[in-house]
Amino acid sequence: MKLPTLKSCQLRGKRVFVRADLNVPLINGTIEQDFRLRSILPTINYIMEQGGKVILATHIGRPSAVGRAHLYDQALSTKNLCPWFTTQGFTIDYEADLVAAHHKSKQHFNHILLLENLRFYNSERESNVNFAEILSYLGDIYVNDSFALSHRNDTSITLLAQEFDDTHRCIGLLMEKEITELTKLRDNKTDDLVILIGGNKIKDKIPMIGHFMDPKRHPNLKAICLGGGIGLAFLKALGYEIGQSAIDAETLTLAQKILTLAGENKRPLILPLDHRVALHGSQDLMIVDVSHKIPEHGTCVDIGPRTLQAFTDELSKAKIIFNNGTMGIYEQSACRLGTCGILGAIAQAPGYSIVGGGNTTSAVYACSLQDKIDFLSTGGGAMLAFIGCHDPEKDLPAFAALAR
């Protein structure tokens, strides 16, 4: 990819509009996890070191006007982020009014100007040209450092980029790193790969799974290990009883198609051998082998020890390891043995590890392994889209807007 980069821009004396993804989990106004905030720091520091003024824009959550007259929600205000930036040594000016922000954008170049949650404006989600023009007045240079929104058509992601000429729009350092790291995986035809996919939302992951099913793209694929809800869908498609775990008809059909494709292309799918099962009316978990019938009143909440060992054994074969999705209901401590076990094995494996996805990243932190993964992506759906699409520069809206 040949997108313009931050280091190719002249920043001194310029107002730099940075579209970031600071969509961090907030509980009562307190940041629960600051991974995405820390990920943007190299870009912010570089701009300030080069003499530029940082105008920082983001969204948080999905504001809704249901039950209220407007989209504003104090719980989702970017004002909640100000104390964090202060603890990092920055002087931050928060401004909710865009007219006032325009005046402040020309002042105090050693301060960060933080705009209010862009999704408090209906126009942000509506691809609104007028809103893009208004935002463009706040900066001389546009920087997209929001990889996690690369697959979205939000105004600040696409139309705003078009308000700046080719020499005044670029990707930030985080975006550049994401592209570099994920390209190692996406376009790799030489290194031995092991892919671990969990979680649910099989429909969202079909293009990515299809990408790895192509033997011409990845002739050295050693295994695709499927756990979590996706693993259950494939077991169901093969006729196994999975208890109360619900798999809808569309998901089942998709799983059957992938199984057929895997057989035709001789792709090595590794499915769960056992699960930890919660029985209705009991707080205890039991381990059930898939060769046995999971009780009708039982729910699979995690992979079992045999599955963990089987997946771990595959990791030793890989030079590159990719994990997206959890192996169970990791939010509950009793149900995270599989997820933490897999992530721990990835951290200890000799291969280069790439892990991503919203829940997967949260699980990495829950298992205290954030410093032991080689690359932790900020992307979820964007990461899946980047890997699974034909040409990211044309197929992902953010990249297409910057490349034109």
How would you describe each model-predicted region?
Residues 1-404:
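Active-site loop-to-helix "anion-binding N-cap" substructures in soluble metabolic enzymes
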